[in-house]
Amino acid sequence: DALVAGMTLNIFNKHSDRVKMACIAQLINVLQSVMLTDGDKMIKTPTYYVFHMMRHHQGAALLDSSLVGGTTVGTGKNELPKVFESVSEDKDGVITVTLTNNSLESSEDVDIMLTNEVTNTV
């Protein structure tokens, strides 16, 4: 769930010129939910923590970014970049970089290049 949420939210952020709002349809006790409950007990799911980490992109300006030396996971039509990323800068100049490693087996070293150009508002 965390990989799907991270990858999807990074893609949405990188396409913020077209995606103005992204929501999760059902919040509790469903697939991809942010919380699970059982009677009076509740836990936050990995999806919750991805949404929590991504919150700094909200209201920020998308910055141009690229990954150098990235590899892929999957094969054929299921092949994806191993790492998805997006970068934003808020009104106070704080830059947020979020990365999603789509591999369940290995880490990936990345280099992120930022330009001074603002492309879209998130």
Question: Residues of each region from the PLM?
Answer:
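Aromatic/acidic polysaccharide-binding cleft in carbohydrate-active enzymes
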Residues: 1-92
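Carbohydrate-binding surface patches
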Residues: 79-119
